[in-house]
Amino acid sequence: MKYFLLFFLALLCTGCQLFQGQQQAGENVATEAKQEEVFVPVEKELYVIKEGTVRDKDFKIKGEAYSFPFGEKIKIVAEGKEFYRTERGDYIEKNNAGNWETLKALITDEMLIRNIDINGNPNDSIAKYLAITQISYEEYQEALKHKVDFLIEDTLSIVKKKGKLTFPCQHKTIYLKDQPDDFENPFSTTYAYVGNMPALNQYLVFEDSEDFYAYIFIDKTTGKQTEFQRFPFLSTDKKYIITVGRAYEDLEGIISLYRIESIKPFKINLLVDESTKWWAAYDFDKQPIFFSKNGYLYASMNVVANFFDEKDELNPQRMYIKIKIK
């Protein structure tokens, strides 16, 4: 029994020493990396091509709250063997950063339709109805030559008077009046007539509030109003409506697809209403979103982290996509 106790104590001591050695080895990784890294001053701009944790001056992970979002542009001021030092003084692993072309090459069809629900589970509703492909700027420009547009911009036919728009419909007249902010409603709202879509028998109105904006269809027969988060693009075969753009406040894109069931009465069925977590289309820009004769919807887009440039303006450096309705 005596020898057994001595043997057990020896094993216990050895195990403790082994655990302490492993713990010390883990703690020394960052220190060893710091000692090995020799930084050379450089000036370059790279993009985060793999979401990675931010590291401090000792190369230790700052925590989950600190991370480089996919696609973010970072200014590099020094380069070592394993890490880059950024302009703001933290560090990123070199294999987590690349140039613009490297970032673009990572944007696959699968990534563009990837969607995660609120619980973090895969959601295939976008992939079920839509195919999204990255294209070149040249292909986008060529498709623009064959743009199909069903909107008639007869903005002078309905003029606002004393802050009120009047829409004569067959069954009744619809009034939309601007709402100034006040004690009960701190957000003002204004309306602007955009035009009409004869193919759908609808007026189109833009609603602009301080905390959101939307587009409204007004049925020319019934006066019924149908609201969309973004501009409703009518497909070339007149069977579907797509809306795509960036959420007003959230750092994510949005995309919706409606199937037109009937025009008189106007009835649509919502098929897709999802957020694209890491990319968004530019829906307010000189480069338009449009349907082309081939039935595809074309748009310029960007990763959310690179949507705006350093001046907080729409980033001219962007990518292009085409969307097919299945």
Give, region by region, the residue ranges found by the protein language model.
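Terminal domain-start segments
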Residues: 107-207
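Blade-terminus and WD-like Trp-Asp/Gly-His loop motifs, strongest in beta-propeller folds
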Residues: 157-159, 194-200, 231-243, 288-297
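Short aromatic loop motif centered on NTY/YTY
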Residues: 239-308
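Surface-exposed loop/turn elements that mediate protein-protein interactions on large endomembrane-trafficking
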Residues: 123-125, 138, 163-185, 209-227, ...
